[in-house]
């Protein structure tokens, strides 16, 4: 959700070329450009060289070939020849081909044009992220207990089973803040 939506500029998007036929936006990357963001995903911090999909999925196997994990975080920052951020406000599936098909090309593809694209420029990455947070609002701060260890698995069949898990952690002197 956008807190204070800026006035629409239906003109040319800076830094991106638009292909209406393929519903895509493309940016030409330099050899040393790095791309950060897109939320929680497998692989490294620099997203270059892979394809990511923005769709919410909770798959049990977090393997390198997964293109989506948990949530949709459609914001990323490019650093290199240009430094800028892009936020795509879109409820559908987005594909981010970040130098996978063509190493020099970052391509965002949507399934329809019902989207808003924000190109955020600034003095540095910190400034760009600050502007992004101004656009979407402050991040939720989790409660203190959430920073501790939480034991989780696919299923607990009974309350007794959960109590056994807690008991075993205590026996082994493993700190435990939550079981879910």
Feature-to-residue mapping (PLM):
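Catalytic and substrate-binding clefts that recognize carbohydrates or anionic sugar/phosphate headgroups
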Residues: 1-144, 153-154, 166-168
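Aromatic-lined carbohydrate-binding/catalytic grooves of carbohydrate-active enzymes
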Residues: 140-180
């Amino acid at each position: 959700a956008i807190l204070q939506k800026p006035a629409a500029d239906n003109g040319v998007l800076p830094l991106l070329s638009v292909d209406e036929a393929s519903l895509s936006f493309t940016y030409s990357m330099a050899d040393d450009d790095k791309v950060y963001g897109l939320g929680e995903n497998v692989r490294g911090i620099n997203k270059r060289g892979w394809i990511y999909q923005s769709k919410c999925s909770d798959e049990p196997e977090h393997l390198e070939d997964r293109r989506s994990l948990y949530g949709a975080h459609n914001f990323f920052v490019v650093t290199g020849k240009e430094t800028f951020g892009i936020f795509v406000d879109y409820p559908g599936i987005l594909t981010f081909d970040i130098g996978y098909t063509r190493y020099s090309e970052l391509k965002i593809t949507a399934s329809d044009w019902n989207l808003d694209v924000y190109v955020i420029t600034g003095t540095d990455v910190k400034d760009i992220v600050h502007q992004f947070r101004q656009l979407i609002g402050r991040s939720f701060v989790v409660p203190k207990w959430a920073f501790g260890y939480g034991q989780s698995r696919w299923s607990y069949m009974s309350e007794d089973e959960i109590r056994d898990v807690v008991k075993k952690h205590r026996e082994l002197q493993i700190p435990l803040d939550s079981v879910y």
